[in-house]
Amino acid sequence: FQTGISKMYLARPAKIDDGILKLSGDEFNSKSVFFDEKKSTLKLKKFVPASGAASRMFKFLNEFLNDFDHENETINAYINRKKDKNLPTFLAGIEKFPFFEEIKSKVKSLVPNYYSLESHEKSYHFIKTMLSSDYFDFANKPKGVLDFHKYQSHIATPVEEHLNECAFYATSNSVSHLHFT
């Protein structure tokens, strides 16, 4: 194990009739009924591959913080200068993120003149606080523990969602098995 496991090289992608079987509606229903009838005799397990740290997910935001000239340019100027396509999408939906209110609240407590800032300055401080190791450190946390879905009653992480999925479709005889890598 000192050298790890050797890489696997794939010959080609799986496609329908070459590694993937396409079922008709009737075949699908038949196999689904068969599975439901037999699942109490099986030990079902939901397999969840590791997603790792969120560093790749927030890479474009780290690049923004490293390259953005906060004192001399607006975010729009940065977007145009870098031809960044991810940042505008992120900013357009920023208020929909389940973690938005918590981070915004922290930014308000950190930035004394928050209410007098222009929108792009608020966005800069939001991103900086979200990624800062002193506060939320999102880029260095496992994706599985980040706030993921916002429900009326609570905010769920991916780990919680996997547990719910496991209970829903990978349960046999009132027992669920879950394997996280």
Where do the language-model regions lie?
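Polybasic, low-complexity association/targeting segments
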Residues: F1-Y9
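Domain-scale recognition of functional cores that engage charged ligands
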Residues: L10-M57, N62-T181
